Structures are given as C-alpha cells and as structure tokens.
C-alpha cells in the first residue's frame, strides 16, 4: 500500500505525479539527433543505398535509401508494375544489390506481377522461358529468393505495417498504395488518402524500409505525355507532399496512321 509506504515504495507514484504536474502536462523525454559533422556526412553518404539500374535515372537521382517514400504514378495498364519490376529484378537492380524485397499486391493477381519480375530478370518472354528453362533458371534463380509476393487484396495499411514489422524487408512495394486506405479502396477523400500516405511514410521510417507506393492517375492524365502531381487520383497535393521522389509514367499516344499492331 502507498498509504503507509516508505520512500522506496512511494517512488512509482512520485514519478507519476512529477510527470503530470502543472495542469497535468506530462514531461517528455526526448533524444537529440547527432548533428556532428561526421554523423551528418555519414548520413548524407548513405542517402542512395539502393541505386537505380536505369542510366538516365541514376544520373539524375542516383538512388534511394531506407525510410524514404517513393511514389510511382500512371494510368491503368501503362506500366506501373513493369516499372518497379525493372527497378527491382532487372540486371543490377535492387535484388541484385542484395535488397530483401516484399511486394504487396492488391490489384492484379500476385502471380501476374511475379511473372513480370521473372521476365525482367531474364530478359525473356514467357514463351522463351518455357522453351529454355535452363537459361531462365540461370538468370532468375540468383535473385528469386530476395523477392517475395503476397496477395494483399482487401487489406489495410495497418495490416501492411504488421507484415513489414514481422518480416523486416529492405524494400516494400505497395501495389496499389491507395487501396490500403483504412476507409476502403474506393475512397476519394483527399484527407483519407493523405493520411494513408503519411502512414506509409511513417512505416518506412519506423521499420527502416524503402516504401514504393504505386498509385493511379486520374482521367485528366489520359493520353497526355506531360504529367503533374495534380493528376494523382483523389490525392491533390497530399501524396506528393509526403514523397521523397515521385515518378509519373506516360505512354506516347499512337500515331494517326498507325495500325493496332504497331508498338
């Protein structure tokens, strides 16, 4: 009992009272960031741990680091998953650099996304892979175990956090990021989508993962090759404001005299 307790037994209660004195404002213990020259130089040098394997990107940005939020935006069927499969699985990509990568798929079937990763790693079509499995194994097997795919259909960002906390990937791909929103995949509320982006960014910082957040662009981006962050579906500036890097992907419109078979 604290009523007749001695100094030792009263200490827990005394700490509580001291922390909540002055109109119950708690005293907060904080840790200061090391702002020494050596630490800031070391931190700056590690900002590009995961290098881009696309030369034009590498020349502009070099790469990204754990704890960052990287947004990829495009219209449907323009190439979001093909783009991140290239960054992750193609030669000299993040898997080849040693990253442990987790792909959370809530749009396409995970097997379809995994097939894109396999073709990116091998440089072969599915037909070519079927005809020459030995070559496919030689090219794909060295990185296969570094990349894991999970069906995340109907899951929330809270669920994604639990998975990331448990499995501790270096890189996690949210495909599609906005569909992890707590209010459901169909929400167009900018405040909800911004909160979802903040949550994704915080997950990356808390667990030391680079978060790749794929998102759809609105109908305003249809047929255009010059894109802007204002074209992100439902998000306005919230998602852009949270991102460390955003890349929007466009597809050149077909020429007037092209046929359906033209690329």
Regions found by a protein language model. Give the residues of each.
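Short, well-ordered alpha-helix to beta-strand connector turns
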Residues: 67, 169, 243-244
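Phosphate-binding/switch region of NTP-binding enzymes
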Residues: 73, 77, 196-263
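Phosphate-binding/switch loop-helix module in NTP-utilizing enzymes
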Residues: 148-206
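Structural motif
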Residues: 71, 171-175, 212
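The Walker A/P-loop phosphate-binding site
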Residues: 24-123
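Cytosolic-facing regulatory segments adjacent to core modules
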Residues: 59, 95-168, 182
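Short, small/acidic-rich helices and loops at N termini and domain boundaries
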Residues: 1-34
């Amino acid at each position: 009992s604290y009523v007749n307790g001695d100094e030792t037994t009263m200490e827990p209660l005394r700490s509580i009272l001291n922390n909540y004195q002055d109109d119950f404002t708690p005293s907060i213990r904080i840790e200061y960031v090391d702002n020494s020259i050596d630490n800031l130089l070391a931190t700056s040098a590690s900002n590009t741990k995961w290098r881009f394997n696309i030369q034009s990107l590498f020349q502009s940005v070099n790469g990204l680091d754990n704890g960052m939020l990287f947004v990829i935006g495009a219209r449907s069927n323009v190439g979001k998953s093909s783009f991140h499969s290239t960054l992750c699985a193609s030669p000299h990509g993040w898997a080849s650099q040693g990253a442990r990568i987790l792909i959370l798929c809530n749009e396409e079937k995970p097997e379809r996304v995994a097939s894109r990763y396999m073709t990116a790693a091998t440089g072969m079509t599915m037909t070519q892979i079927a005809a020459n499995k030995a070559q496919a194994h030689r090219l794909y097997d060295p990185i296969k175990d570094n990349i894991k795919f999970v069906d995340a259909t109907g899951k929330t960002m809270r669920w994604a956090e639990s998975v990331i906390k448990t499995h501790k990937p270096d890189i996690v791909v949210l495909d599609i990021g906005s569909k992890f929103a707590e209010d459901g995949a169909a929400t167009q509320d900018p405040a909800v989508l911004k909160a979802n982006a903040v949550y994704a960014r915080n997950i990356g910082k808390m667990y030391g993962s680079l978060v790749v957040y794929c998102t759809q662009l609105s109908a305003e981006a249809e047929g255009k090759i010059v894109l802007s962050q204002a074209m992100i579906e439902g998000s306005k500036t919230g998602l852009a404001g949270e991102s460390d890097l955003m890349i929007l992907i466009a597809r050149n419109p077909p020429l007037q005299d092209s046929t359906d078979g033209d690329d």
